[in-house]
A protein has these predicted regions:
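Nucleotide-activated chemistry modules centered on ATP-dependent adenylation/adenylyltransferase
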Residues: 1-245
Length: 245
């Protein structure tokens, strides 16, 4: 099932022995991608973009990955959304109106500069939504030249000119979950009935998951975003009112 993903990775491995992988720690696409990349590259730097640093429920995934893939490096950088939160004082975070705004492209270039690695891998899939489908399908044509100067098709997964690749481009969530199960990898984190969506501090399912499983992580989030506590309080009040009826 994943021969196409392996073919994409193999194409890039002919160009470089080192890659940057944007890695969410607990998400299914990141878990599967690291397993697929590890046999093909000498150096892999996993870049984790955080909203709140040092959350234990995320760190268990980092420890698992380091144990299974001992040569992998991890680098933590602020999520691009965090800069916007700070600029506007979102959910009570300490506000700085002069905070410079960063995009994913800005962070990518900074990480390239810090690591000396050019090629970047992300877990984007066409099935994620219309914008990603349009972007990835545009890579079906020639997207640049390889290191030998030959024109190369992107196979809807490789941007040769910008040196970015997306091995999971044509797969669905169910395919990725099957790969994880079949290869004995750590299951991705789930909040309620949904898959992990990272550190979504406005998601009641995420906050309740932490409340019952990692209460110290919840307090860390509240210490940075004090107004996030209101989301949880409102939900509890709603449940209390329903019980009274």
């Amino acid at each position: 099932m994943f021969e196409r993903a392996k073919d994409i990775i193999n194409e890039v491995s002919k160009e470089t022995d080192s890659v940057i992988l944007f890695h969410s720690l607990s998400g299914k696409d990141s878990i599967a991608l690291l397993d697929l990349l590890y046999p093909k590259f000498r150096r892999i730097v996993c870049v984790y973009m955080y909203i709140v640093k040092g959350l234990e429920h995320m760190e268990v995934y980092r420890r698992w990955a380091k144990s299974r893939y001992p040569n992998v490096e991890f680098m933590d950088v602020p999520h691009y959304a965090l800069y916007s939160y700070i600029k506007h004082g979102y959910l009570g975070i300490t506000r700085n109106a002069k905070q410079k705004q960063w995009s994913l492209s800005d962070i990518t270039e900074k990480v390239r500069e810090m690591t000396g690695i050019e090629w970047v891998c992300c877990g984007f899939k066409q099935s994620d939504g219309l914008n990603r489908r349009l972007m990835l399908r545009s890579y079906g044509k020639v997207t640049g030249k390889d290191s030998q100067g030959n024109d190369r098709e992107g196979k809807e997964a490789i941007q040769w000119k910008t040196k970015k690749f997306y091995p999971l481009s044509t797969y669905y969530n169910r395919d990725v979950l099957s790969y994880i199960s079949e290869n004995g990898l750590k299951n991705p984190e789930c909040y309620g009935v949904a898959q992990s969506n990272g550190t979504d501090i406005t998601d009641i399912n995420y906050l309740r998951y932490l409340q019952f499983n990692y209460p110290s992580d919840l307090e860390k989030i509240f210490s940075v975003f004090p107004l996030a506590r209101i989301t949880l309080m409102n939900e509890q009040n709603k449940k209390d009112n329903q019980n009274e009826k």
